[in-house]
């Protein structure tokens, strides 16, 4: 072999490395970008195939053309096994095709179609499973909503007769027993559980009403307004106006109640006292009597000191006389006792 043939042997080795690596013509600012995933795009044969076909150096025979595809030259004008078949198929491809499609190869076409059909079936299975799951969830939600709607009860509308009977029973006892509830159920023609719920709501309403005014009826009874009423002091106008306007639920019934309220009784007593002449006469008589009593007590208090001194002196003299009398009486008692001893 000559030196020229050795040089030709070395040329394909140098030119084959960039073809299987990164194609410099396809590099840009963003990096490596390929037009497709065909074999010609991966090997970089498409960009060099078109100028070779249109160039004047194309040989008359097909072997020379296939041997010089893409500017590559092989020893003896022959291609390796497999590469010649791919290059011949690439040479038969029309020049305007953007990429090498697998449909041009009859052996790969059946494989790609079968693979594509398998992917479609898998996607359909996935979508069908998702649809089933979503459908099951929707069915579960609908069933849960239907159960919630079934559990909801309708509000019981009480008649005036039923409310009257229930209020009477509540005034008698806030916590009726089973027997009382059954009797109410017979009178009102209501179920026993409905009556129990009504009493629970009525007790809550009663507690709320009791706590509205003064925070508690007991506290209000011993509070400021209760003391004012007990001492006949007029209440504020806001409290009285609230009772007159019909807001009896906002105040304690014992304070401003119409039948027997403390405020009403105290106001009646105050009105009667200044109007009757007997009361005025009795008041003046009591005042005069009190003045006389005070004068007599003052004078008696002044004379009381002298009387106490005289009484002290008299008491001392009487005590001395009593001591003397006891001393005089004691000797004969002793004699009598001695005589009794001798006789014994």
From Swiss-Prot:
Residues 147-156 have a biased composition (Basic residues). Residues 37-44 are annotated as: Octapeptide motif. Highly expressed in the central and outer tiers of the inner nuclear layer of the retina. The keyword Zinc-finger does not apply. Residues 211-268 form the CVC domain. Gene3D superfamilies: Homeodomain-like. This is Visual system homeobox 1.
